[in-house]
């Protein structure tokens, strides 16, 4: 089973039904729900997601959505090493650097899924948009 790290932008697309991106993100979460892939999210994403999602709903509704998300995915820790690696990196976006190092430190992550691939140009992990991941996954599954 492939382990995929899901960036917060993809999760926001899914949870807010943000068009035109929500279709691909919903398919990825369907694959996770069907246990065809394993989804991973950093612990940092939860606070970022709460902040963004709170603009769309009540505290209670957002917490409920995040609880459901926590049941679907593995939550990867952000610790001292993660932050120090991010601070020492050449990433232009600090939040993305923390996401990247959280994914990289989890040795079983096979790829990172984001719509923001330009910020991960120096990644040692494969970085794909949701659309590219789905095409790759379908091609691999059918062969």
Positions of predicted regions on the chain:
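Short, well-structured N-terminal submotif of metal-dependent ribonuclease cores
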Residues: 1-40, 54-61, 122, 128, ...
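Short, structured coil segments at secondary-structure junctions
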Residues: 71, 123-124
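Active-site-proximal, substrate-binding regions of enzyme catalytic domains
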Residues: 26, 44-48, 52-82
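Short acidic-hydrophobic, aromatic-tinged amphipathic segments that line or gate anion-handling sites
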Residues: 76-78, 127-130
């Amino acid at each position: 089973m492939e382990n995929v790290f899901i960036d917060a932008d993809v999760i926001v697309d899914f949870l807010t039904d943000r068009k035109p991106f929500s279709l691909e993100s919903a398919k990825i979460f369907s694959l996770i729900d069907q246990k065809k892939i394993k989804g991973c999210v950093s612990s940092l994403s939860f606070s970022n997601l709460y902040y963004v999602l709170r603009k769309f709903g009540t505290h209670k509704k957002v917490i409920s959505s995040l609880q459901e998300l926590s049941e679907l995915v593995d939550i990867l820790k952000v610790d001292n090493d993660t932050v120090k690696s991010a601070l020492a990196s050449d990433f232009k976006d600090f939040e993305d650097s923390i996401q990247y190092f959280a994914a990289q430190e989890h040795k079983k992550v096979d790829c990172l899924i984001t719509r923001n691939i330009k910020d991960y140009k120096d990644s040692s992990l494969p970085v794909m948009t949701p659309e590219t991941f789905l095409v790759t996954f379908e091609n691999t599954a059918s062969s």
